[in-house]
Amino acid sequence: MAVQQNRKSPSKRDMRRSHDALGFSTLSTDSKSGERHRRHHVTKDGFYRGKQVIVHPVESVEVDDEV
């Protein structure tokens, strides 16, 4: 098991943790739909880099003719 040789000061601990903060994700605008999305991710409409890569199925409406 690893055991530290000397105790680290709070300053050294905080300097090590200085890079742990979460940053904001970079957003891009789709050229086709104009929708904002995370970079390198598909938009909610299914577009990626101006091309439709996912086609959402159309919900069919059932009609009852038994009236």
UniProtKB/Swiss-Prot annotation:
SUPFAM superfamilies named in the record: Zn-binding ribosomal proteins
InterPro entries: Ribosomal_bL32 (IPR002677), Ribosomal_bL32_bact (IPR044957), Ribosomal_zn-bd (IPR011332)
Annotated Gene Ontology cellular component terms: large ribosomal subunit
A biological process term (GO) from this entry: translation
Disordered: region residues: 1-44
Superkingdom of source: Bacteria
Disulfide bonds: none
Gene Ontology MF: a single term: structural constituent of ribosome
UniProt cross-references to Pfam families, sorted A to Z: Ribosomal_L32p
Record carries keyword Ribosomal protein: yes
Keywords, alphabetical: Ribonucleoprotein, Ribosomal protein
Compositional bias (Basic and acidic residues): 11-20
Keyword Ribosomal protein part of the UniProt annotation: yes
Family affiliation: Belongs to the bacterial ribosomal protein bL32 family.
Protein name, entry field: Large ribosomal subunit protein bL32
Gene name of the encoded protein: rpmF
